[in-house]
Amino acid sequence: MLSRLLKCKIHRAVVTHAELHYEGSCAIDGVLMDLAGIREYEEIHVWNVTNGKRFTTYAIRGEDNSGIISVNGGAAHQADVGDLVIIATFGDFTEAEANAHKPRLVYANPDNTVNHTANCIPVQVA
């Protein structure tokens, strides 16, 4: 049996473009994609922290070090420039793989540069 686990995420990136008439997708700064381990054309989940909307699309590579996070096509109705988003991917793992798995977590600054990276989320305390 396979378990679906968080593979990677970019946490609190800022939407820089919302392009309704661009071919659907989400363009992500190539440096952020590489650090997170997101592949071009990979399915991504986008969770809009600002308005609570969630949607699924695919990633395309944006210019390296540009800071671009562009929500394109119909998904542009789900995000506005300046919104905070979390971009995540998931993977299916065998039990042995799941036991050893650590997600790749990239935390963004407000200009979409990298604040820090991690491979675990701290325990939430009451």
From Swiss-Prot:
Family to which this protein belongs: Belongs to the PanD family.
UniProt-annotated location(s): Cytoplasm
Record's comment on post-translational modification: Is synthesized initially as an inactive proenzyme, which is activated by self-cleavage at a specific serine bond to produce a beta-subunit with a hydroxyl group at its C-terminus and an alpha-subunit with a pyruvoyl group at its N-terminus.
GO biological process terms held by the UniProt record: alanine biosynthetic process; pantothenate biosynthetic process
Listed EC numbers: 4.1.1.11
Cofactor(s), names only, from the UniProt record: pyruvate
Species of provenance: Acinetobacter baumannii (strain ATCC 17978 / DSM 105126 / CIP 53.77 / LMG 1025 / NCDC KC755 / 5377)
Oligomer status and interactors: Heterooctamer of four alpha and four beta subunits.
Catalytic activity: L-aspartate + H(+) = beta-alanine + CO2
Disulfide feature: none
Residues bound to substrate: 57, 73-75
A single Gene Ontology CC term: cytosol
Record-linked Gene3D superfamilies: 2.40.40.20
GO terms, molecular function: aspartate 1-decarboxylase activity
Pathway: Cofactor biosynthesis; (R)-pantothenate biosynthesis; beta-alanine from L-aspartate: step 1/1
PANTHER family per UniProt: ASPARTATE 1-DECARBOXYLASE (PTHR21012:SF0)
Major enzyme class: lyase
Cofactor binding notes: Binds 1 pyruvoyl group covalently per subunit.
Gene giving rise to this polypeptide: panD
NCBIfam families in the cross-refs: panD
Protein purpose: Catalyzes the pyruvoyl-dependent decarboxylation of aspartate to produce beta-alanine.
Protein name per Swiss-Prot or TrEMBL: Aspartate 1-decarboxylase
Chain positions found as Pyruvic acid (Ser): 25
Record key words, sorted: Autocatalytic cleavage, Cytoplasm, Decarboxylase, Lyase, Pantothenate biosynthesis, Pyruvate, Schiff base, Zymogen
Active site: 25 (schiff-base intermediate with substrate), 58 (proton donor)
